[in-house]
């Protein structure tokens, strides 16, 4: 992970700090349908000011996805890990955090049981430079809809296919 520190003096400047862990944006495997629900408040708690009409109930929209399978990719840069003191224990903590990402994470946006980590694939190279590029490793996992599935609604509607890379075997863990 990294950080940008902004400083203000006579001249504004910022300093970027790079960390060894890189986490990409999650991307849906199949297109998702975004549904909307209109919401209102049931009680008007706003006071009427002199000369003003009472405020009407606030109405808004809540948008949600009933089902989506998302893939997130990442990596750990060994050179930056050495420079920053990132350890094997830290890597194990990141791995466990990914596996348990949605444990005790319920909210109105993510009701309990609505989000889960299906599986974590964790590759460990046998050298600092890596046996393969991150892009090649990421492409070695293919996720696609099973034959005959038109509208996926569960993770089981997908096939998870590992294309072997010689000398590099992932650790595969189920999420919690």
Which residues fall in each region the model found?
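RNA-binding basic/glycine-rich loop and surface signature characteristic of RAMP-family CRISPR effectors
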Residues: 1-176
